[in-house]
UniProtKB/Swiss-Prot annotation:
Job of this protein: Catalyzes the NAD-dependent oxidative cleavage of spermidine and the subsequent transfer of the butylamine moiety of spermidine to the epsilon-amino group of a specific lysine residue of the eIF-5A precursor protein to form the intermediate deoxyhypusine residue.
Gene3D superfamilies (UniProt xref): Deoxyhypusine synthase
InterPro entries on file: Deoxyhypus_synthase_arc (IPR022899), Deoxyhypusine_synthase (IPR002773), Deoxyhypusine_synthase_sf (IPR036982), DHS-like_NAD/FAD-binding_dom (IPR029035)
EC number: 2.5.1.46
Keyword flag Zinc: no
EC top class, as a word: transferase
Signal peptide: none
Name this polypeptide is given: Probable deoxyhypusine synthase
Keywords carried by this UniProt record: Hypusine biosynthesis, NAD, Transferase
Length: 310
């Protein structure tokens, strides 16, 4: 360790007013010291290079944030073509479709779930989802699309199916519509785990020659991975979305850039709690990669982190 180098960046006080822009605040975060703010700045710098270089950028996230207003931020990122590939869950399709046509409502974590059940209201954290805003509307819209797609051909890669359903939605408020419009592939490795997947099963029960080709999705992902000069990933939360992102990147010796936003901890034993450092041992992140783990609530961190790019 070099003493002079270690003492080269003094901690500086924040200087902010009501007119301070987020980009300026982000620059000040570089010398704030402390905890999350410094990590957010590091993530910002990594994402800035990720977006500016000849890099294939993955965006992975779970479904729950799409039930919140963060859907609008993700949608704007997709509209602006800031990312090249999305990897997410079946629930993302559910919430994106449902919220295109129906409202979800602000509530509380402390409401009685027994009473909510009796009222026909589902609780997702502090978001309230009435029965009529979820299953019924998803079934109606997905089944309409499946009938049309089945008439075209009997076997579909999931990524193509999502593309076509997105085009059918034809609403600027929809993530999968804008992804389809901008030719950003949306991969859902756990497609049957959700209402969208249940509609696929239900349709299959009536049309046994209807097939979903998941291996074609993996073939498409392999082409993306092996054609990429560099890869980077913005990963919000963990689970299958995060793992499928880093899993495929091991076949090119790992991600060159990685930003992981999470509240999970290593001691819970989950993939969500695993730091990016652990992924280096699996060759899912390169040893010389630029990466950072940012701990905190994505609904707070992501708007601050991404707003300067919008």
């Amino acid at each position: 360790m070099d003493r002079k180098e270690l003492l080269s960046r003094p901690v500086r006080d924040l200087s902010i007013t009501a007119d301070t822009r987020l980009g300026d605040l982000m620059d000040q975060f570089s010398s704030i010291g402390g905890f999350t703010a410094a990590k957010i700045h590091e993530a910002y710098e990594i994402i800035k290079d990720m977006f500016s270089e000849d890099n294939t950028t993955f965006l992975s996230f779970p479904a729950d944030i799409i039930s919140t207003g963060l859907r609008g931020l993700i949608n704007e990122v997709v509209k602006r073509k800031l990312v090249d590939v999305i990897i997410t869950t079946s629930g993302t399709l559910d919430h994106d479709i449902a919220r295109t046509y129906r409202n979800y409502y602000c509530g509380s974590f402390s409401y009685s779930d027994i009473e909510l059940r009796d009222l026909g209201i589902n609780r997702l954290g502090n978001v309230l989802v009435p029965d009529e805003s979820y299953g019924e509307i998803i079934e109606e819209k997905v089944m309409e699309s499946l009938e049309k797609l089945y008439a075209k051909k009997k076997e579909w890669a999931t990524v193509d199916l999502i593309h076509e359903v997105g085009l059918d939605i034809n609403s600027e408020s929809s993530i999968i519509y804008n992804a389809a419009k901008n030719n950003i592939p949306v991969f859902v490795p756990g497609i049957t785990d959700g209402s969208f997947g249940s509609q696929l099963w239900s349709f299959y029960e009536q049309h046994h020659d209807f097939k979903i080709n998941l291996l074609e999705d993996e073939h498409r992902l392999s082409d993306i991975i092996f054609d990429a000069k560099k890869t980077g990933a913005i990963m919000i939360g963990g689970g299958i979305s995060k793992h499928h992102t880093i899993w495929w990147n091991q076949f090119r010796d790992g991600l060159d850039y990685a930003v992981y936003v999470t509240t999970a901890q290593e001691y819970d034993g989950s993939l969500s709690g695993a730091k990016l450092e652990e992924a280096i041992s699996w060759k899912k992140v390169r040893p010389d990669a630029r990466y950072v783990n940012v701990y905190g609530d994505a609904t707070v961190i992501m708007p601050v982190l991404l707003a300067p790019f919008l």
